[in-house]
Amino acid sequence: MQFSAMTMNMFVPGNDDPGDDNRIIDMALAQSIWLAELGYHVWFTDHHFRGPWHSNPMQFAAYVAPLIPRDRYMGFGVLSIPFYHPVRLVESMNLLDQLTKGKVLFGVGSGWQGTEPNGLGVDPEAHASGRLAEETLDVMERLWGFKYGDPECSFSVGSHSGRIKRRIMPAPYSRPYPTIIRVATREAGIVRAAQKGWPVFVGVLGADLREQMQLYRRALDETNHPQDVKDNCLRWCSYDWVGVTVAATDEEALEREKLARAETMAIRGSFIQRHGKMDGPVMKATPGQSTADAYAKGGDMKATIAGTPDTIAAKVKQLADMGINHLHLRFLGEWDGETRHICKTSAELFAKEVLPRFAEAQPSRPPAMAAAH
């Protein structure tokens, strides 16, 4: 099983002082290296107007790459692809794929509603529907497949358009393009990802994990992809948004989880009070409830596990038995706050006591990512 950890979790700045940005960036860098040295693949968010390093996560990852062990992957959870010009996005992904020899996992999706699409000039309705993400991904596939001699490739998606006559440079290291992990919350999206040969995020934000995993496996079995493509899909099929707290006893872990959640919600509430509503990655909990309201109430922290290493390992075993091979972990606790020790202890205990029980042999180089078209 593969284990990834999110740098600084869903960071919200405790204060909005530009003079503090460098300290936070250095903190995120140090934590990324520390997590990788503990044994985790490191992941970064892609957000705007709410944190000093994840407004350009690919540039941040390019700096991190040579500083972490060579067998670690980096990932993005997720790149908000409607916010990018498709040509620039494919160029950046290809270059990072080349620099890391394929050791980057590009989670892709729509991103958040509200401030971000408004600030980036993206139509909020088209963005919220998910249509722009699908259209952008279609254009990206066309760009990856374009070669010399092909007819001119023109496209228009959202506010972005282009016309190319030459291939995208550099080409990706992986074939036919870098490893994509697709956010798919609906059945149609899960089936489409399997048909494309893409891993997916399953169980996102309270969805039925077992049901989604069974659907994905059935859809993957019905494809004609080579076995190595199917294996790669299952290797990186990811259970996302798992909040983890590990301690010496179950009781202590549950108490620490409460403390960590309380500080996160206090910081989030303060930010909302100062800057207005903040949309987040949560589905509407009740009819008529906005994502901003749900996020303000902690709707993104429903999937949590807390306990001793043995308790945590038992829960991980249940997930492994469902066919989950990649856990995307968020160790609860504010790294820039009073509950940093909770995050630190959890990550260290998990790495020492849980991770070795599910270790798998790492390939000397990542398998080429190939999908049938």
Annotate each language-model stretch with its function.
Residues A5-T7, A126-M169, L209-N325, A359-H373:
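An alpha-helical appendage that flanks or caps ligand/catalytic pockets
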Residues V42-Y63, S80, V204-G206, R330-K344:
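Glycine-rich, proline-tolerant flexible connector loops at the mouths of alpha/beta enzymes
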Residues M1-F76, Y177, A368-H373:
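N-terminal beta1-alpha1-beta2 module of alpha/beta enzyme domains
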Residues F3-T7, V42-T45, R72-G77, V104-V108, ...:
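Hydrophobic faces of well-ordered beta-strands that scaffold small-molecule active sites
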Residues F3, L35, H47, V64, ...:
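Conserved, mostly hydrophobic/aromatic
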Residues N9-D26, G77-V87, S174-T185, V244-A247, ...:
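Active-site mouth loops of central-metabolism enzymes
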Residues M1-D21, P82-F155, P199-D208, K258:
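Flexible, glycine-rich active-site loops centered on histidine and acidic residues
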Residues H54-F76, L132, K344-S364:
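Alpha-helix-loop-beta-strand connector modules within alpha/beta enzyme cores
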